[in-house]
Design a protein with these regions (language model features):
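Nucleotide/pyrophosphate-binding catalytic subdomain
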Residues: 1-216, 384-385, 400, 404, ...
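Conserved dinucleotide-binding and phosphotransfer motif residues
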Residues: 32, 88, 222, 286, ...
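Active-site beta-loop-alpha junctions enriched in small/polar residues
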Residues: 43, 231, 295
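A conserved regulatory-domain signal marking ACT and ACT-like small-molecule sensing domains
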Residues: 57, 237-414
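Short hydrophobic alpha-helical runs that function as membrane-insertion/retention elements
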Residues: 168-172, 226-228, 291, 372
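Acidic-aromatic/histidine active-site loop/patch
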Residues: 219
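Active-site C-terminal subdomain of aminotransferase-like
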Residues: 224-235, 259
C-alpha cells in the first residue's frame, strides 16, 4: 500500500456541495487501496473575510491574534470534510497544525516550517483512518498558533508528504495543471505534462499562481513528486519532478508575468565604490525586496541606477531612496509604476544559444521597448510598459512555438 497526500484549495472546498465532491474523490482513492492524508485550505474568500473583520474591529491588529483568527478557516473545512467522510462510512479524523505538531518559527502570518513530527499522523494511519489536516497553520516553540502565509496549505501538504515518505503529493486546484502561459491571455496556451522543480520554482516566483514558491523549494529539497491537477475533472494534470534529459529538449517551457512591481531610478549617482551598498542597505533593513537592478555605463564619474520593488512597498522605498540620494549628492529620483515584467523559462536554455536574441527580436517586431533585462541559467525577464503586456505574452508564446504540440525543440545533440 502506498501513501498519497492530497491537498484541496479554497475553490475546491468553497461550499458544502464541493466538500462532498472532495470527499467522493478521496473515497475513490481510498477504495483503490491507498493510505491518504488530505490537507485542506479554508473555503474560498474565508481568510479575506476574517482579515476584514480583524481590521474592522482594530485598526492595526496584532499578528499573533490575526493568526489565531485566520487559522479557524482551515479548522472549519477539515472538520466538515472529516464529518462528510464519516457519513459515507469511512473512518476519518481531522487534525489541526498543533495536533500534527507542525513546528514553525515565531514569525506570525508568514511563519517558516522548521520540522514536522509524523508520530500522530502515523498512529492515525495505522488505525486505518483517513487523516484530514488543516493546512496553512503550525505552532511555535511557545505553543502559539502561527500561519504560513498565502498559499501555505501547499507547503503543509509537501511537508507532510516529505515526513511520511509519501509516493505522491497531489495538489488539487481550479485549473487543470501548469500551463505554458496564462490561458486567459493566450487561448493557445497548452497544459505542460511534466516540468522540473527548477522551472516550477522560476514560474512560481515569477507570477504563476498555481503553486506557492516555498512548497516547490521544499519538494525539491526532499524529492517529493507533485501532481498539480483539477478537482473538477478526472484529467491528468502536470507532474513536477526531478529534471530529466527529456526536458532539455524544450528550449522554453513557459512564459510568466508580474504586474505588481514598480521601478525607481536614481539619476546621476557618483560612481564610486560602496555606492550600491549605501543605496540597497537601507532598503534591506526596511525588509523591501529589490528584484531587478540595472546600472548605466558611467559618464564623467556619474551613473544612473534603476531597480524594481513591489508596488506595495513603493511609497516607503521612495522615502528611503530620496533620503539616500540626497546624502550621496545624486541629481534626484524618478519612479514608474506603469510597468510589467514578462519572463521566459526553460531548462533547455542552458544548452541552447540565441534564446535571448529571439525573445528581443519577437518583442521588437511588435514595437515593444525593453526597459530592463535580467537573466539566470533558465530564465530571461524583461520589464516593458504595462499596456504591452498581453501582446508581449502572445507574441513570445507564438515565437517559441508553445501553442503547438510539437514545441520547438533543441537539436538532439545539444
Amino acid at each position: 500500500v502506498g501513501l498519497i497526500v492530497q491537498k484541496f484549495g479554497g475553490t475546491s472546498v468553497a461550499d458544502l456541495e464541493r466538500i462532498r465532491n472532495v470527499a467522493r474523490r478521496v473515497a475513490r482513492t481510498r477504495d483503490a487501496g491507498e493510505d491518504i492524508v488530505v490537507v485542506v485550505s479554508a473555503m474560498a474568500g474565508e481568510t479575506d473575510r476574517l482579515l476584514e473583520m480583524s481590521r474592522t474591529i482594530c485598526k492595526e491588529p496584532s499578528r499573533r491574534e490575526t493568526d489565531v483568527l485566520v487559522s479557524t478557516g482551515e479548522q472549519v473545512t477539515s472538520a466538515l470534510l472529516a464529518l462528510c467522510l464519516q457519513g459515507m462510512g469511512y473512518p476519518a479524523v481531522s487534525l489541526l497544525g498543533h495536533q500534527v505538531r507542525i513546528y514553525t518559527d515565531s514569525n506570525f502570518t508568514t511563519a517558516r516550517v522548521q520540522s514536522v513530527d509524523g508520530a500522530r499522523l502515523r498512529k492515525e494511519l495505522s488505525l486505518g483512518k483517513i487523516v484530514v489536516v488543516a493546512g496553512f497553520q503550525g505552532i511555535d516553540e511557545h505553543g502559539d498558533i502561527t500561519t504560513l502565509g498565502r498559499g501555505g496549505s501547499d507547503l503543509t501538504a509537501v511537508a507532510v508528504a516529505a515526513v511520511l515518505g509519501a509516493k505522491l503529493c497531489e495538489i488539487y486546484t481550479d485549473v487543470k495543471g501548469v500551463y505554458t502561459t496564462d490561458p486567459n491571455i493566450c487561448p493557445e496556451a497548452r497544459k505542460i505534462n511534466k516540468i522540473s522543480y527548477d522551472e516550477m520554482l522560476e514560474m512560481a516566483s515569477l507570477g504563476a499562481k498555481v503553486l506557492q514558491t516555498r512548497s516547490v523549494q521544499f519538494a525539491k529539497k526532499f524529492d517529493v513528486p507533485i501532481h498539480v491537477r483539477s478537482s473538477f475533472s478526472e484529467e491528468e494534470g502536470t507532474m513536477v519532478v526531478v529534471e530529466d534529459r527529456d526536458m532539455e529538449r524544450f528550449v522554453v517551457s513557459g512564459i510568466t508575468y508580474r504586474m505588481d512591481e514598480g521601478k525607481i531610478t536614481i539619476k546621476k549617482v557618483p560612481d564610486t565604490p560602496g555606492i550600491a551598498a549605501s543605496i540597497f542597505g537601507p532598503l534591506a533593513e526596511a525588509d523591501i525586496v529589490v528584484d531587478m537592478i540595472v546600472q548605466n555605463v558611467s559618464e564623467e564619474g556619474f551613473t544612473d541606477l534603476t531597480f524594481t520593488v513591489p508596488k506595495g512597498a513603493m511609497e516607503q522605498a521612495l522615502r528611503i531612496v530620496e533620503r539616500t540620494a540626497e546624502n550621496l549628492g545624486a541629481k534626484g529620483t524618478t519612479f514608474d509604476e506603469d510597468i510589467a515584467k514578462v519572463s521566459i523559462i526553460g531548462v533547455g536554455m542552458r544548452t541552447q544559444s540565441g534564446v535571448a536574441a529571439k525573445m528581443f527580436a519577437a518583442l521588437a517586431s511588435e514595437g515593444i521597448n525593453i526597459q530592463m533585462i535580467s537573466t539566470s541559467q533558465i530564465k530571461i525577464s524583461c520589464v516593458i510598459q504595462a499596456k504591452y503586456l498581453e501582446l508581449a505574452i502572445r507574441v513570445l508564446h507564438h515565437a517559441f512555438g508553445l501553442g503547438e504540440d510539437t514545441v520547438q525543440q533543441a537539436p538532439p545533440w545539444a
